[in-house]
Amino acid sequence: MSIDSNEIQQLFSSIVSLVESHGLQDKQTPAARKIECRWMIASVLAPKTSGDRKADAPLLEELSGQLNSRYGRGFGVPCLRDMLEVYRAFPNKEGLGSGLSWAHYLALAKEPNHEKRLLLMRKA
């Protein structure tokens, strides 16, 4: 999947807007708001990615570099991939309303069976 520099800049601007409006980098921001922001970042990225690690690498590497230059850390390629994985596992934002931590959502996202994932969520 090829993406031009203008599209990358638009993605970058959209992500910056989300990070700043949700206070993602602020230590005082509640965890639920940070989780919502990560999900929203992934919702912006998902249409431009295929889910294929190799094909998505150039886009994620470019965005990661720009975001880390602006914010310091927290936007490495693995972090962006994690955001996408959680987004794909929980395509409806309402599915994130159970009060779990980001680490819980990451672990749940790795479960390929949707029904089992829901069962694990209820147990958590």
Question: Where do the protein language model's features map onto the residues?
Answer:
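Basic, low-complexity intrinsically disordered segments
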Residues: 1-124
